[in-house]
Amino acid sequence: FAHRCSVDAAEKVNKISFQNNIPDWDAEGTSQPGEMILITQSLKELQLVMSDYVGIVRNDIRLQRASRRLDLLWEETEQLYQTSTLSPQLLELRNMITVGYLIVKGASFRKESRGLHYNTDYPGKSELVQNIVL
C-alpha cells in the first residue's frame, strides 16, 4: 500500500502549483510570552478537564461543564496566541484544546454506552451502531 501511495504522489506532485510569494512571518506587535507558566497551567487544566469530565464514565452534565471550561481555555489561549510570538508549546496547547472539543462534541452526540465509554444518562447500548462524524 505504501508503495502505491508513493508512486501516486510522485505522479501528482508536478501537477500541483505551489505559491512562492508567501510573506515571511511578521512578529510586529507580539512579544515573548512573559510567563510560560500560563501555557503550562492551561495544559494541566486541560488534562484535568478531560480526565474528570470526559473520562470513561461520563454524563451530559459533565460533558457540558467540560465544553464550558474548554471555551474559557480557548479564549485565554487565543488571547495569548494573538499577542505572543509562536512557540511549539503554545501551538500544541491550541491543538490539544481543539482535539478536546472534538472529543466532547462526539461524546455529546452519542446517546448510548458502548465499549469503554459509559454514559450514566444512557446506560444501554443502542440497536443502531453509528459512526459520529464531526
Spans of features found by a protein language model:
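Glycine- and aromatic-enriched mobile tails/lids
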Residues: F1-L134
